[in-house]
Amino acid sequence: MIQIYNRKTKQYDIEQVAGGRLLNTLYTTGRGRLGLKLLVKRKIYSSLTGFFCDSKISRKTIKGFAEKFSIDTNECESKVEEFKSFNEFFARKLKPSARVFDTSEEKLLSPGDGRLQAWENIDTEKLLQIKGMTYSLSELLQDEKLAREYSGGTYLILRLCPVDYHRFHFFDSGKCMETRKIKGEYYSVNPVALSKIPELFCRNKREYSIFKTDNFGDVLFIEVGATSVGSIIQTYIPGERISKGAEKGFFKFGGSTILLIFKKNMVKIDDDIIMQTKEGFETKVLAGEAIGNCIDKRTK
């Protein structure tokens, strides 16, 4: 059972996990771990899943999936019957009114829908993936020099579930550099998997870019793939001027994760998110939701 903090009600909701029973089998039993090693973590499994989700026949699963997980299809730009495949629905665009991005310069906004955790004054060689398990930023990036620049900074994990809106956005205006792609496995990013697989983020397929923001400095914007995520699609144009709230890209079917890493003294995350993280809970947020503030440039 996964409890998620709800900022509106100030209560804890129980997360509905798509394929929860299968996840537990794969990551907590000997038979499951064998299947994980031989097939599920590999690209071929994600490719086959992606092939089905791109097919016309997969559209028949959309209505049932949306109903089971209480997805508000009224937020979609397109009607449910207009989607030609499950992946089209999974990577759906929303009406502009469904996710509103505050244009205030000082506000840090969530880049996507998901479950958020945040840490301040980080040791880049001991980043948490879950309580009791750490990994190295230099290994994640495969760049020791770049990783050192973020020592003492702020680190955010935004975990997306299959039921979430899977497009992600720029949380500030600025320019985003070229994306670097790193090959890897396709482990789940569910807490069950994170608690069983050491250095999972460093093992999975991932992409990162340096987002040169107007108000938060140079931020590492990292996308981590997961089980069934055959593709991380970047839709932005590197080096071009970006407006706050503009789309950066999207994930195809599966769970996935976004990591944001800020340099020291650039951002202050909201107290409730920091407190919940310390208590071991994730906080549910939506794309465009305020999650912190930039630190006044005059104090730097």
Curated annotation (Swiss-Prot):
InterPro entries: PS_Dcarbxylase, PSD-B, PSD_type2_pro
Signal sequence segment: none
Record's keyword annotation contains Iron-sulfur: no
Cofactor(s) required, per the database record: pyruvate
Keywords: Cell membrane, Decarboxylase, Lipid biosynthesis, Lipid metabolism, Lyase, Membrane, Phospholipid biosynthesis, Phospholipid metabolism, Pyruvate, Zymogen
GO biological process: phosphatidylethanolamine biosynthetic process
Modified residues (Pyruvic acid (Ser)): 256
Alphabetized GO MF terms: phosphatidylserine decarboxylase activity
Membrane topology note: Peripheral membrane protein
Pathway: Phospholipid metabolism; phosphatidylethanolamine biosynthesis; phosphatidylethanolamine from CDP-diacylglycerol: step 2/2
Cleavage (non-hydrolytic) (site feature) positions: 255-256
Catalytic activity, EC: 4.1.1.65
Group of enzyme by EC: lyase
Membrane-spanning parts: none
Catalysed reactions listed for this entry: a 1,2-diacyl-sn-glycero-3-phospho-L-serine + H(+) = a 1,2-diacyl-sn-glycero-3-phosphoethanolamine + CO2
Localization of this protein: Cell membrane
Cellular component aspect of the GO annotation: plasma membrane
UniProt entry tagged with the keyword Cell membrane: yes
Pfam family, one: PS_Dcarbxylase
Cofactor binding, per record: Binds 1 pyruvoyl group covalently per subunit.
Superkingdom of origin: Bacteria
Family designation: Belongs to the phosphatidylserine decarboxylase family. PSD-B subfamily. Prokaryotic type II sub-subfamily.
Subunit and partners: Heterodimer of a large membrane-associated beta subunit and a small pyruvoyl-containing alpha subunit.
Protein's job: Catalyzes the formation of phosphatidylethanolamine (PtdEtn) from phosphatidylserine (PtdSer).
Name of the protein described by the UniProt record: Phosphatidylserine decarboxylase proenzyme
Organism per entry: Ruminiclostridium cellulolyticum (strain ATCC 35319 / DSM 5812 / JCM 6584 / H10)
